[in-house]
Amino acid sequence: MDPFLQDHWGDVHTSLTTYARNQLRPQMPADLRVRVEEYVGLEIEQDEEEEVLSRQKPDVLVTENWSSAEQTAIAVSEAAVADEPLVVTTPRESETLRRVLIQDRRGDRLVTAIEFLSPGNKYGEALIHFRKKQRELLLGGVNLVEIDLIRGGGWAVFPPDAAIPGSHADPYRVVVVRALRSERFECYPAGIRQRLPRIRVPLRPGDRDAVLDLQLLVDQAWEDGGYSDIDYARGPLPKFEANDVEWIRERLAQQGIARIL
């Protein structure tokens, strides 16, 4: 896994969802279909490091009149009356997120939801909202496949942080939860130094699991996105652990890139 792809996650995320759909479609029974769905996620206030992980968007300004009732909360001297201001607010930003859905053609029943997490899923209220949606999907009988290839942010995949061994949680997390066995979490190791796993994608009871090769998806996104021009001399955020920095230097030196970080 190339951790520098995180700096270009908007483009990479779009590619991963599309390629995942394409990889899964030939494995579907005739009465199931695979679709990419767009939805709007919240962007919240973040500290400097977290802000780097989020996409920049144009500001949208909304104006409103300030009512006299709202002004009563402010003490005004009898000798001086302030001019009434024009109040300008900036709403919470939103970003378009995507996920892969497997549906039963008969009645459009949702069978499995596959999510490649984005920075916008992993902070503050957006994280709380994401976890709420997870619970709703499971209660509705939907299988969950959650793939977190983002370094930094809160624990967003379904099982509690403490339930996942460190070998399967750092720095990336891949978890499958079957709706009929929601107390069980199928966890796959996913690190910087190893090949990303081939994971089982559950369908309906009685259907054979599909297989999703995550490394093939990332390789294709890297190739098709033309990311050979990444500036490896500039370390991404969040910073790497010292032992990872040394390993990355060695790998890039083998490819003729002499200096990074």
Say what each PLM segment does:
Residues 1-261:
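Gly/Pro/Ser/Thr-rich low-complexity, intrinsically disordered segments predominantly at protein N-termini
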